[in-house]
């Protein structure tokens, strides 16, 4: 996939978001989504979210990406959307539009490997370019069909 690069900027954490999570981040960024940066993968694996408090946040159309350096890759992430029927997204290309430039700059690498630590788990090849990001990975077709208009 080739998607637009969204450069994240430093931000402050909304009060409801701070109250909704069990670990406070070491860095807060914002592009379309909030990006909460942590110091290790274990915190991303064990993040707990109070859904009642989390759903008070209005960041439509965005969500919240939790990220840290990875044990076996360049970075890991998880992605949650408040007020959504799908609380945690399995593999989120749109959040990587901001995660890739952040980690590329921080690690001083153009090509990165990312793992999204959802229940399904997604392993992505990532690359930051001037105005866009490239995302690759393995996928399986689960549905084929035709639409007649």
Regions found by a protein language model. Give the residues of each.
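Active-site proximal loop and beta-alpha junction motif in alpha/beta enzyme cores
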Residues: 1-149
């Amino acid at each position: 996939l080739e998607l637009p690069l969204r450069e994240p900027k430093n931000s402050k954490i909304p009060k409801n978001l701070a109250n909704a999570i069990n670990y406070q981040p070491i860095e807060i960024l914002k592009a379309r989504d909030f990006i909460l940066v942590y110091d290790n993968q274990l915190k991303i694996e064990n993040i707990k979210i109070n859904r009642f408090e989390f759903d008070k946040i209005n960041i439509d159309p965005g969500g919240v990406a939790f990220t840290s350096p990875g044990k076996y890759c360049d970075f890991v992430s998880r992605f949650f959307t408040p007020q959504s029927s799908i609380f945690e997204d399995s593999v989120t290309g749109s959040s990587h539009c901001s995660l890739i430039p952040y980690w590329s700059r921080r690690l001083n690498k153009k090509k990165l490997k990312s793992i999204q630590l959802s229940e399904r788990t997604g392993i992505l090849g990532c690359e930051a370019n001037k105005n866009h990001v490239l995302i690759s990975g393995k996928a399986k077709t689960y549905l084929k069909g035709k639409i007649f208009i």
